[in-house]
Amino acid sequence: MLFLLAGFEINPQTITGREGKRGLKTWLATLALAFTLVMSLYHASFGELSIDALALAIALTTTAIGALMPILKERGIFTRKTGESVLAYGMWGELGPVIAMALLLSTRAPWITVIILFTFITLAVLVAVLGQRAAKAEHQIFLVLSRGRNTTSQTFVRVTMFLLIGLVAISAIFDLDIVLGAFAAGFILRYIVPENDHVLEEKLNAIGYGFLIPLFFVVSGAKIEVTAVLNQPLLLIGFIAMLLLVRAVPIFIALHTDKTPEVKALGWRNQVTVSLYCTTALPLIVAVTSVAVSAGAMSSSLASVLVSAGALTVLVMPLLALLTYQESKDSSHQ
């Protein structure tokens, strides 16, 4: 549900526009930096890296954009330039690691995974386009669903749940991370639901942020081995430091060297703010470490430390970002 809401909130132009493309290049740079760092830690070449090393490198490039959405909205940053930059850079920290997981942590041949990924993405785009056309043409099926959306039938909510479960199931069947299916469901909804229609969004927010998303964090926390974390405090701090080095520093450099007037107008403090927000990472760390633990390549104690570090970033990074944020230099896009 966390990733469905993230996909639903994102305007495709945000990640395909100029700053979005810069965000992609920056994420690729963070990926290269992460692998360089991990290879030096493991004293191995790229081809010699084990699954746990690959998982660690991917985890260093993640951004918990779904967890950041409500924070940005509550602080009034979501509709401002700072929020737009967080989405442009942070969204690739959500999408990129999912694709990297599929390609690098899969037991299949890479070319087979590429074909499956391409097929899945094509299917999602096709459903989105057909759904959008049906909505614009006021097709009979869409009209029936519209009439029941605010009644006890709650047709839009039911279709959303069906879409979410269906795409997550397809992802699982083809051994793709279920995050991809959930995000695709949000992407499809974005195209089908009219832009100014916030009724469904409010209902999904109530279901997600009121129950399912807190449940996800509770379950993630319940899996943490507290003794393992307490016994390895330096590893915990070290991983957070690596996240800052790999994720925050490249994003700050990309923003600081951007010559666009709007980005330059943010000032270095708001550029630091964007970088700190984008270093918030938990959900995909849970996903990456789960794959490595299931494969027997990572111990549950190490996974617990990494997940705990991710949880700390969700608490600490937004707090630090609040301290560096300068509203007077942040233009509104509302």
What are these regions (language model features)?
Residues 19, 78-92, 115-116, 198-201, ...:
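Membrane-interface alpha-helices at helix entry/exit sites of multi-pass transporters
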Residues 1-22, 140-239:
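Membrane-interface junctions of multi-pass transporters
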